[in-house]
Amino acid sequence: MSVILRGVVVGALGAGIGWANPYIPGEPVKLVFKDFASEFLDYHCLECHDEATKKGDLSLEDLGPVDETNAALWKSIWAQVSLKEMPPKKKEQPKAVERLPFLDWIVGELKRVMKDKGGFQAHLDPQKGNFLDHDLLFGELPDGIELAKPASPKRIWRVTPQEHITRLNELINTEPKYDPEKPGVRTRGDTVPTNHGGELKLYFGADRIIKWQGGTVAYATSVKSVPVVLSSTRKHGFENYPNFHTVNSAEATQILGKAEDIIRYMAYGPLSIANPEQITDDPATYEKVRPKGDLRGLPTALVYSTKVKRPLTPVYELMKASKLTEELLLKAVNYVFEAVTFRPPTDKELEQYLLVTSEAIERVGKEDGVVIGLSAIFLDRDALFRSELGVSGKPSKDGRVMLQDWELGLAVNHALSYIKPDEQLRQSIVDGRMRTRVDVKREVTRMLADESFRKPRVLRFFRDYFDYDLGGYICKDDKALAATGVPGRGSNHYRAMFDATASTDRLIELILEEDKEVLKELLTTQKVVATRNDSKYFGRLKTKEERNAAIAAQKKADKLAKEKAAAELENLKEKLAALDAKIKAAKDGQTKKSLDREKKQLEGAKKRVQNIVKRGAGTKGDPALKEAEISGPKIFARVSHRSFGNGSMKPERTLTTVPEGERMGILTHPSWLVSHSDAMDNHAILRGRWIRERLLGGGIPDIPITVDAMLPDQPNTTLRSRMRVTRDTYCWTCHEKMDPLGLPFEMFNHAGLHRTTELGKPVDPSGVIVDSGDPKLDGPVENALDLIKKLSESERVEQVFIRHAFRYWMGRNETLNDALVLQEAYQVYRKSGGSMQALIASLVTSDAFLYRR
């Protein structure tokens, strides 16, 4: 482009993109390609991407307005310009007042063009949240930009799978009240935990089973359980955004079927899933009448206690009554509706479901009719979605409307809880005291301060943020796993990972109880919550010299044990010979019987000693592994109902510390390390991407479909060496931001064990922070601990944490209009000494949470 033409374009950009009036982010850009986007491309892009230059084999010279044929290219332009990858850093950069309208124009055009072709929602994707420039959010607002008052869009928000199954669990199981003497034990209001196999299931009557036939697998197949219905992709990061989840027809059909099971259990308890003779406090009575043969794995293999443990509700009263009355039916409909929607029905809704149930009773009789009618309520919109439409408020001049009454009350409840509002919050809603910011502040402060009020949504934030709960779902190669130093066969490893998730949950809760410098503590704590089997996972692989010394010590111990056993064997032989003589001489039967018992004991001892002489002492322990010492106060972690017989998960845990210099914080715990690994090895790229996105606030564009994103298969080569292919010029632009941040974690293997050598050579855990956005952070790091320490002390890292908290509690990506909300939340977090409670209160009382547009 000529200098003269560039001058003309600059003038056009100044008039067009600079706007006659201040630019308001998010407002529709009502300009056409020729007069606007084309000029931006001419000035900022064509110098490198015209037909003559064509850098990266890409020409934009003939690119026209957005249409379905070039939508992919425009999406790529949007990503590159958003991340400031283009124009390159050495080139003149567009001002914010030029770049932001250009990006808004692309988004608007892609939404318009792709409306009937699957739509365009990339800008709403939680993984694209960092595409918004961090410095714009926390720095001074550039000239020419004016912010609109914050508000979230009107929406209906599907409940999460965890929230849905916890709602249903409330109908059929009575969870214990909070016990301050046993914090950590599963309590009413806690989320339903996954079971021993990582499945999220609803169990019927598990708390009443007192006997079963068979072992662990037989129990698991005998007990009545139903899996979670609502779909959710089990992947890294936040996923609970309203834009990305709905309820399909298959799910609706399943919900209806499960609703019938639930209604019947509410009415009849185990009688709905078992025969009357199975319900007894004396299992021997069932043994006399049970079906003959092998019942393992069948529902008839179970025996239930007669003690009623489920909630006895109006549904029970309705079905128990010999005569159907309108009052009983009314109470049952009211109860079920509020139980699954968290609010009382309107007169119209009540009339509708009474009619449905009454007609069903007329057609098929009372029992089946009640089940059919009440099951329909489980498919009510508000049983599956939470509406935030601002139906009660009055819109202001700027188009915003504040949530009020039930909409606001349920939004506040959802911010912390999975079960319906407690009595105080419900009464506030009914009394009209959930209409102002002060009302919200009052209720949120109360609930946050009350330990007995369970807050599973807070814990879920940390699961989604850290992604430490995925380790049990990564299918490991048995041989590769065995080489790490942990059991490589059977389900032991996967059970250990699901236990590790529960343990990490508990550690986070302990840090939240202290509520001081929460993020820094999570990143740097030396504390761990562990089971007794975690000594291997928190252990360290020995050096070659240490292994040789351990093997030599084992051999020496075996030799000494054999020598001692040989001497003991001779002694036992002499004793047995003498005893044989006594037995022969014994005349009365009682004496002989006593001597025979003594001989049997000596022969058992002789056999044990002979085994030691033959095979050695069988010294316990892996000579290649130094196991961690698990000692400290006994505590509890939250686990599922009995799901695997006697092999079910146990809540008992130990609060201990890790060896200094080996680990630091959650990012060095096996739960996080394995969650960021693959079947065969570590996943340094995934770990580095996590650091880049979750702590540094950087963004990574999507991998082009033409890229074969595979490392070479070289089993006897270190991961660092195999990752050399990512240093190719085409790859390194993105991998430079990830690889050097993930490779410091090579001081651990893919089962999470600490190591100093790999394939017989010293491990290289060095790395480097580049282009972090904070010059004080950039530079080399020695290993993962050095990296974590630097990051934990960074102001930028805390601000990025605030951004992620915003996304989670608002259910959307932040926009530039949310800048003041984010800045205020950060100041509150800092002034409170890093309090999570203060941060949540700030976010939940912000305009972005309270208002809809």
What is the meaning of each model-derived region?
Residues R6-G16:
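Bacterial N-terminal signal peptides
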Residues K89-Q93, D116-H123, E277-I279, T346-E351, ...:
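Short coil/turn segments at secondary-structure boundaries
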Residues Y241, L271-K323, L384-L410, H414-S417, ...:
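Long, ordered, helix-rich scaffold segments
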Residues R186-R188, H196, A206-R208, W212-G215, ...:
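Substrate/cofactor-recognition hotspot
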Residues A20-S76, Q80-P101, L330, L579, ...:
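Sequence context surrounding c-type heme c attachment/ligation sites in exported
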Residues G18-T285, V289-G297, A301-R310, Y335-A339, ...:
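Aromatic- and Gly/Pro-enriched helix-to-coil junctions and flexible linker segments
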Residues K55, P87-P88, R112, R343-D347, ...:
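Secretory-pathway/luminal and periplasmic proteins that interact with or process carbohydrate-rich
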Residues W19-N21, F33-K34, W74, L83, ...:
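Extracytoplasmic c-type cytochrome modules immediately beyond a signal peptide or single-pass transmembrane anchor
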